Amino acid sequence: MSHTMGKNNREAKEKKGQPEPLSGSHKVKNRNHSRQKHHAHHDM
């Protein structure tokens, strides 16, 4: 029973932790993309 609980806890933590970092990475990527696009426009 302890093994199942540990596995369940680990899966729940991984599932909950996956969407959080993905969202953060997306936000940073989006910001970087916007900045790079602006820079390219300026160069032009």
Swiss-Prot record:
Principal place of residence: other
Protein family membership: Belongs to the SspP family.
Top-rank taxon, per record: Bacteria
Protein keywords: Sporulation
Disordered: annotated segments: 1-44
Subcellular compartments: Spore core
UniProt induction comment: Expressed only in the forespore compartment of sporulating cells.
Residue stretches of biased makeup (Basic and acidic residues): 8-18
Compositional bias annotation for Basic residues: 26-44
GO biological process: asexual sporulation; sporulation resulting in formation of a cellular spore
Pfam families: SspP (PF08179)
Family matches, as InterPro entries: SASP_SspP
Protein name: Small, acid-soluble spore protein P
